[in-house]
Amino acid sequence: MKEIGALQAEYPLVNKLIATKEVFWINPHIEKYERAIKDSPLNEENVKDAEERLKRFAPYIAKVFPETKGTNGIIESPLVKIPSMKEALETNYKQTILGELLLKCDSHLPISGSIKARGGIYEVLKHAEQLALQHGMLTEEDDYSILDSDTCREFFSKYSIAVGSTGNLGLSIGIMSANLGFNVTVHMSADAKEWKKSLLRSKGVNVIEYEDDYSKAVEEGRRQADADPSCYFVDDENSHDLFLGYSVAASRLQKQLEELEVVVDEDHPLFVYLPCGVGGGPGGVAFGLKLLYKDNVHCFFAEPTHSPCMLLGLMTGLHDKIAVQDIGIDNVTDADGLAVGRPSGFVGKTMEPFLSGNYTVNDEELYRLLKELADTENIYLEPSALAGMIGPVKVCKEDEYLQKQQLTEKVKKGTHIVWGTGGSMVPKDVMNEYYRKGLELTI
């Protein structure tokens, strides 16, 4: 790896990252969709396969999780207009947001209340399906609700699943695995919230705590799983299945946009702002959206100023060969879901030609935005889920991207979607504390 001095000389923005200042970075490696997709390790067929698998599991999900009955076992979240929040953002940041502002409420996804309910649950279901098919417990033509039986639970109890997590991925994998009957262990980093650990333990999940950060929890989880042939490790840093589970969100969003009569085409661009930790969730969603909307969708990742791992990896081209700690950043943030020091190399390399840009936001801003959204729209998100909310302001204010892409006029007829990644399962007293912090910082 290059010396810090060499990185600073080659990439002046690194200086602002080191100083934990907010930055806005336009990806110089973005390519036209038709060119980018040719070199992609994944394609439309992979996403369709994931979509079909989730449909096969829908009867099981509807039976085991009654809160999904209304959507027939499809785990999906609302897409809502937030005009009052848009007004507040314009007033507070003295910046007109051109186009309409919507919020994708993955914070209110059933089962585990975060975007991780997409990828995490999907990967567990795929593993369960493979085991059940191999051992003659199931055929693809069966009604998958038969998996909700003592016989199947007893069968799955011979196997275990492990994952390393800062919290939300652990919740979705823990809850799903335990329901199927797997023995499940979640390796949790120091920044994982206490209530998330307690909730997992209450579901019968084995939680192992570390005093180190996320990368260490993943490393330990991987090591322990390698030593046990019956253990399946969900590898958040390298998993194609997690990524594809997230990417299914795109076709669902397309239907919701149609229902809201929102047009996305060359004259009506779509901008999507996704909070980013190790990269799987935002990467998968953005990839799915690019497959559908090609060059008419513009995806931006959002990271905390103290954990800008994906931005650092993409900007320097070093991907997972560099961690924020290597340039003296502490990776300590209240945005626990985004507290990742080293990005996924697989996601970074896959998304490099598709991603429009990346920006950072400080913790205090997240709390202010949390309070503002609660006041204006009565929607409560956890701090990390607000990272996307400042995106439309940044894109409109620093209009270099709009100019480069010849969008300065088109953006007026465009749509901005902020991906609200988590929050509905946060205990009331914890959420009140978040709100209080936002209030103190606003006064």
UniProtKB/Swiss-Prot annotation:
It catalyses: D-serine = pyruvate + NH4(+). Its cofactor is pyridoxal 5'-phosphate. It comes from the Bacteria. One of its GO terms (molecular function) is D-serine ammonia-lyase activity. InterPro entries: D_Ser_am_lyase, Ser/Thr_Dehydratase, Ser/Thr_deHydtase_PyrdxlP-BS, TrpB-like_PALP, TrpB-like_PALP_sf. CDD domains: D-Ser-dehyd. The modification N6-(pyridoxal phosphate)lysine is found at residue 116. GO terms for biological process: D-serine catabolic process; isoleucine biosynthetic process. Keywords: Lyase, Pyridoxal phosphate. It holds the Pfam family PALP. Its EC number is 4.3.1.18. The keyword Cell wall biogenesis/degradation does not apply. Belongs to the serine/threonine dehydratase family. DsdA subfamily. This is Probable D-serine dehydratase. It comes from Bacillus cereus (strain G9842).
